């Protein structure tokens, strides 16, 4: 009908939307959307058949530090918010699709994870000639023949990528992961205490160095496969000592997530969300739509116990099953108008868990309203 719509980059927790009904002469008052983002750039692509693709980050940064206590010290402009101190939500991005002019969205598939997300020289690697920002929140996309989309993400030479995907990928209803091909599909980074702040004439722009958190270890059965180990690492160089893992699945209002685990230490926090939260962010219990802690007392005698979460955001409830034990009912926090699309696993303790939890695999199945 000629209406113009813009999704705005903001410093809040979400994009804002504004409309123009007079070819851009005037715009409505911007209002919040349900699309999670902080200081990242969104992009739309109108397809030839009328559908709309929305590229954005769908992520939340780590909680703000007391900027007066940061060392080395920040500038006054960085303390007062004129410039940023650090970006911790720009290592992932996603794409959603709408068939009704943006009224409803589906997909929310993780498009690309920053390949530098675990590197201990994240701040200084590469040069400044191709951009100081080593993030993946910039998008340029075009439609190709045969239902394909080509999108360019990122700007720095070390991280930018050109990706081609099929639009049908956004309509898939299952996903699984067993780590036989590594950790490329999950976020596991932990942050090193680093220099904060913007560019000061040499490499480093609002970024912290990182290193590996969760790692692959031999399966206890000795079958030559591997499993992920999450445990506390008592290391004073780290931002904190928790470890975590974040994995994306197709968005759905109803679904089942299955995880094969062996909790050996102080417990595993399992959370389901509608957006990406850092693996080491301990505020996940506040922002997750569903969250619970599984303990070793709930494990089966066998090596692996299957934990299932059957969730329904329309009814605002979920049932958690661990092995053959009675289901635990979980109450939903907040809202999820676009359904859930992220599994977040994290050590339940921030220290002293040297045994940790082994994670063998996980899978997701979408459920329809009739199921």
Predicted regions and their residues:
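Short, aromatic/His-centered strand-loop micro-motif at the edge of beta-sheets
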Residues: 288-308
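Secretory/extracellular carbohydrate-interaction modules
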Residues: 221-295
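Short tryptophan-centered beta-strand motifs in secreted/extracellular beta-sheet-rich domains
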Residues: 259, 302-322
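Beta-strand-rich interaction surfaces with strong enrichment in secreted/lumenal proteins
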Residues: 31, 243-250, 294-299, 332-333, ...
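Short strand-turn-strand beta-turns centered on an Asx-Gly dipeptide
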Residues: 23, 321-326
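Asp-box/BNR beta-propeller blade signature and adjacent active/binding-site loops
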Residues: 1-185, 192-214, 234-236
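Intrinsic-disorder/low-complexity, polar/charged segments enriched in Ser/Thr/Lys/Arg/Asp/Glu/Gln
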Residues: 3, 51, 174, 254-258, ...
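Flexible glycan-contacting loops in extracellular carbohydrate-active proteins
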Residues: 327-360
């Amino acid at each position: 009908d000629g209406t113009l719509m813009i999704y705005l980059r903001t410093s809040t927790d979400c994009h804002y939307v504004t409309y123009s009904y007079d070819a851009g002469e005037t715009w409505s008052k911007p209002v919040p959307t349900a699309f999670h983002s902080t200081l990242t750039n969104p992009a739309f692509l109108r397809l030839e058949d009328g559908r709309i693709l929305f590229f954005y980050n769908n992520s939340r940064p780590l909680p703000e530090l007391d900027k007066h206590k940061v060392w080395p010290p920040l500038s006054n402009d960085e303390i007062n918010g004129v410039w940023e101190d650090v970006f911790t939500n720009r290592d992932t991005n996603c794409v959603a699709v709408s068939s009704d002019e943006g009224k409803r969205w589906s997909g929310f598939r993780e498009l690309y994870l920053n390949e530098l997300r675990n590197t201990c020289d994240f701040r200084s690697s590469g040069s400044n000639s191709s951009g100081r920002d080593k993030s993946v929140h910039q998008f340029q996309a075009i439609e190709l023949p045969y239902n394909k989309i080509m999108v360019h993400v990122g700007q720095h030479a070390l991280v930018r990528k050109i990706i081609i995907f099929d639009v049908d990928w956004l309509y898939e209803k299952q996903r699984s992961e067993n780590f036989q091909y590594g950790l490329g599909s999950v976020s596991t980074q932990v942050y090193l205490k680093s220099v904060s702040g913007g560019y000061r004439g040499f490499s480093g722009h609002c970024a912290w160095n990182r290193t590996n958190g969760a790692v692959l270890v031999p399966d206890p059965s000795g079958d030559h496969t591997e499993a992920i180990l999450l445990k506390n690492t008592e290391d004073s160089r780290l931002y904190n000592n928790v470890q975590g893992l974040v994995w994306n699945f197709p968005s759905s209002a109803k679904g089942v997530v299955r995880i094969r685990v062996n909790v050996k230490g102080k417990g595993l926090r399992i959370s389901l969300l509608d957006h990406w939260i850092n693996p080491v962010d301990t505020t996940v219990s506040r922002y997750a739509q569903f969250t619970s802690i599984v303990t070793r007392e709930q494990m089966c005698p066998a090596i692996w116990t299957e934990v299932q979460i059957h969730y329904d955001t329309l009814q605002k409830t979920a049932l958690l099953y661990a092995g053959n034990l009675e289901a635990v009912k979980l109450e939903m926090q907040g809202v999820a108008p676009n359904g859930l699309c992220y599994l977040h696993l994290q050590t339940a303790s921030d220290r002293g868990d040297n045994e940790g939890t082994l994670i063998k695999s996980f899978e997701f199945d979408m459920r329809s309203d009739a199921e």
